Amino acid sequence: MSPSDDPNLGSIVAGRYRVDALLGSAGMSRVYLAEQLSMGRPVALKLLRPEIAREPDAVLRFRREVEAVTRLRSPHAISFYDFGQSDDTLFIAMERLDGEPLRARLERDPVLQPDLVLHIVTQTCECLAEAHG
């Protein structure tokens, strides 16, 4: 689907979030750059794909993701602000981070300095330890 064909772009989700641009896409969901209208706050808005939202197991996994992340208290994990359903659309509004995605960085510079790799891996492991600890 091209960005111009995306029906979510420009839409208002749950009367609270304006969808501005597609950030990324995965098997179950799409993540958009959005604005929380009441506060003028930028957010990342994760929308469960409509065809997936009809599958009870997928909805359960989406809800479990919310429960797991809201329990995390790590400086290496993003914060979830809101979760809900608007019409047939399940959504998560979360902290929006600025910066370059790791994938883009690796495409631009496939060989990273060892100290940067250590820094990234350490932060990732600390967050995983918190999540599974």
Regions from the PLM with identified roles:
Residues 83:
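Activation-segment/catalytic-loop signature of the eukaryotic protein kinase fold
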